């Protein structure tokens, strides 16, 4: 096989598929984030009843993102989506300080789940465009993220509305999928 045919074969190689689970409390901005990633209109978003799935191409990956509703009545069903998750993205409303304890409890429970053990986690500290938003460093400290030892993790400031910080988070995702799958 000549060099040219090898290059053609590499070029036509399909993107590596990655299963991403997008979780967080209701109104954290998960669906807005997903639509921002897919370059879709974000002006009319309603609470997710059940789930949304979108595939997004990024850096040689086909990211299959499962956006699961965050209302309290839906959260018990989250576990039905854990299987074969490559990356967990957890979205926090940085401006809703009254719910930091609740979101911290939910995240801690997710990190204890056997089916999610060792799965890299990206925490998006969303809504940074709001004046009342807590900085990512304060959220990381409040959630004791420094105690996470069984997986790689990252907290990323972002605004799903403006798109700021979203690409930085997705770059981290693509880097860590590669590291995990080697």
UniProtKB/Swiss-Prot annotation:
GO terms for cellular component: centrosome; ciliary basal body; cilium; cytoplasm; cytoplasmic microtubule; extracellular exosome; Golgi apparatus; Golgi membrane. A lipid is attached at residue 2 (N-myristoyl glycine). This is ADP-ribosylation factor-like protein 3. Mg(2+) binds at residues 31, 48. It is found in: Golgi apparatus membrane; Cytoplasm, Cytoskeleton, Spindle; Nucleus; Cytoplasm, Cytoskeleton, Microtubule organizing center, Centrosome. Changing residue 90 to C: In RP83; uncertain significance. The keyword Cell wall biogenesis/degradation does not apply. The modification Phosphoserine is found at residue 5. It comes from Homo sapiens (Human). GTP binds at residues 24-31, 48, 67-71, 126-129, 159-161. Changing residue 149 to H: In JBTS35; decreased release of NPHP3 and INPP5E cargos to the cilium. It comes from the Eukaryota. Found in a complex with ARL3, RP2 and UNC119 (or UNC119B); RP2 induces hydrolysis of GTP ARL3 in the complex, leading to the release of UNC119 (or UNC119B). Interacts with RP2; interaction is direct and stimulated with the activated GTP-bound form of ARL3. Interacts with SYS1. The GTP-bound form interacts with ARL2BP and PDE6D. Microtubule-associated protein. May interact with GOLGA4. Interacts with GGA1; the interaction recruits PKD1:PKD2 complex to trans-Golgi network and is required for ciliary targeting of PKD1:PKD2 complex. Interacts with DNAAF9. GO terms for molecular function: GDP binding; GTP binding; GTPase activity; magnesium ion binding; microtubule binding. Pfam families: Arf (PF00025). Keywords: Cell cycle, Cell division, Cell projection, Ciliopathy, Cytoplasm, Cytoskeleton, Disease variant, Golgi apparatus, GTP-binding, Joubert syndrome, Lipoprotein, Magnesium, Membrane, Metal-binding, Myristate, Nucleotide-binding, Nucleus, Phosphoprotein, Protein transport, Transport. Belongs to the small GTPase superfamily. Arf family. The keyword Cell cycle applies. One of its GO terms (biological process) is protein transport. It is a peripheral membrane protein. InterPro entries: ARL2/3 (IPR044612), P-loop_NTPase (IPR027417), Small_GTP-bd (IPR005225), Small_GTPase_ARF/SAR (IPR006689). Small GTP-binding protein which cycles between an inactive GDP-bound and an active GTP-bound form, and the rate of cycling is regulated by guanine nucleotide exchange factors (GEF) and GTPase-activating proteins (GAP). Required for normal cytokinesis and cilia signaling. Requires assistance from GTPase-activating proteins (GAPs) like RP2 and PDE6D, in order to cycle between inactive GDP-bound and active GTP-bound forms. Required for targeting proteins to the cilium, including myristoylated NPHP3 and prenylated INPP5E. Changing residue 71 to L: Enhances the interaction with RP2. Does not induce a mitotic arrest resulting from the loss of the microtubule-based mitotic spindle. Induces release of myristoylated proteins from UNC119. Interacts with ARL2BP, GOLGA4, PDE6D and UNC119. Its main location: Golgi. It is linked to Joubert syndrome 35: A form of Joubert syndrome, a disorder presenting with cerebellar ataxia, oculomotor apraxia, hypotonia, neonatal breathing abnormalities and psychomotor delay. Neuroradiologically, it is characterized by cerebellar vermian hypoplasia/aplasia, thickened and reoriented superior cerebellar peduncles, and an abnormally large interpeduncular fossa, giving the appearance of a molar tooth on transaxial slices (molar tooth sign). Additional variable features include retinal dystrophy, renal disease, liver fibrosis, and polydactyly. JBTS35 inheritance is autosomal recessive. Retinitis pigmentosa 83: An autosomal dominant form of retinitis pigmentosa, a retinal dystrophy belonging to the group of pigmentary retinopathies. Retinitis pigmentosa is characterized by retinal pigment deposits visible on fundus examination and primary loss of rod photoreceptor cells followed by secondary loss of cone photoreceptors. Patients typically have night vision blindness and loss of midperipheral visual field. As their condition progresses, they lose their far peripheral visual field and eventually central vision as well. Expressed in the retina. Strongly expressed in connecting cilium, the myoid region of the inner segments (IS) and in cone photoreceptors (at protein level).
């Amino acid at each position: 096989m000549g060099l040219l045919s090898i290059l053609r074969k590499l070029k036509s190689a399909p993107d590596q598929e990655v299963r991403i689970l997008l979780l967080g409390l209701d109104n954290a901005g998960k669906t807005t984030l997903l639509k921002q990633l897919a370059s879709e209109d974000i002006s009319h978003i309603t609470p997710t009843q059940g789930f949304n799935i979108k595939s997004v191409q990024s850096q040689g990956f086909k990211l299959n993102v499962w956006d699961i509703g965050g209302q309290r009545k839906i959260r018990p069903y989250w576990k039905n989506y854990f299987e074969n998750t490559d990356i967990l993205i957890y979205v926090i409303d940085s401006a809703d300080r009254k719910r930091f304890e609740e979101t911290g409890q939910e995240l801690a429970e997710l990190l204890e789940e056997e089916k999610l053990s060792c799965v890299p986690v990206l925490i998006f500290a969303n809504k940074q465009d709001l004046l009342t938003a807590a900085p990512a460093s304060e959220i990381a400290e409040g959630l004791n993220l420094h105690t996470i030892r069984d997986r790689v993790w990252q907290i990323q400031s972002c605004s799903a509305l403006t798109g700021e910080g979203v690409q930085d988070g997705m770059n981290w995702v693509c880097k860590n999928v590669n590291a995990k799958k080697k």
